[in-house]
C-alpha cells in the first residue's frame, strides 16, 4: 500500500508544470487523477492567479519521500524533495523567475477515493530544514 501512495505522490509533482501550461478548462482533468480537495482547488486557484500575471511553472520537484502512516483511507507522507530544477517561469520570456531549493521539507496527506486511487489532499511546506 505504501508503494501505491508513493507512486501517486511522485506523479503528482510531475503534472503541476503541464497543468500550468494547459488551458484553464483542461487543468482539472490533468490534476484530478493525482489531487483532491482541498489541494486540488488550491492548485487550480494558484495556477490561475499565476497565469493572470504571466507566470507558469517549469521543471518538476524530485521527491525523496517516505510514508509515515496509513490509516484507513488516509496516508501521511514526509518528504525532503529536491526542488532545485523547478520554479516559476515567465510565460512571456520563458525565463525562470524563481528556482527551488535542493532540500525542501514537505508534509502531505493523501486520501484514497472510492475508485481506490490515492490522491494528494494537502501539501504543507514546513519552512524547516531536512
What is each residue range found by the language model?
Residues 1-56:
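Core segments of small alpha/beta cavity-forming domains
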Residues 26-39, 63-66, 74-78, 119-121:
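Short low-complexity stretches enriched in small and charged residues
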Residues 39, 83-85, 127:
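Solvent-exposed loop/turn segments at secondary-structure junctions
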Residues 40, 60-62, 70, 103-108:
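Short, surface-exposed, polar/charged, turn-prone segments marking secondary-structure boundaries
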Residues 52-93:
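Surface-exposed, charged secondary-structure patches
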Amino acid at each position: 500500500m505504501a508503494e501505491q501512495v508513493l507512486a501517486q505522490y511522485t506523479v503528482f509533482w510531475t503534472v503541476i508544470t503541464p497543468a500550468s501550461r494547459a488551458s484553464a478548462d483542461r487543468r482539472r482533468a490533468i490534476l484530478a487523477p493525482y489531487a483532491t480537495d482541498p489541494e486540488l482547488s488550491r492548485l487550480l486557484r494558484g495556477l490561475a492567479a499565476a497565469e493572470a500575471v504571466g507566470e507558469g511553472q517549469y521543471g518538476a520537484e524530485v521527491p525523496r519521500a517516505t510514508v509515515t502512516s496509513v490509516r484507513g483511507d488516509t496516508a501521511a507522507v514526509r518528504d525532503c524533495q529536491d526542488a532545485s530544477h523547478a520554479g516559476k517561469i515567465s510565460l512571456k520570456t520563458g525565463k525562470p523567475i524563481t528556482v527551488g531549493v535542493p532540500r525542501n521539507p514537505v508534509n502531505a496527506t493523501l486520501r484514497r477515493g472510492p475508485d481506490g486511487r490515492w490522491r494528494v489532499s494537502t501539501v504543507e511546506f514546513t519552512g524547516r530544514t531536512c
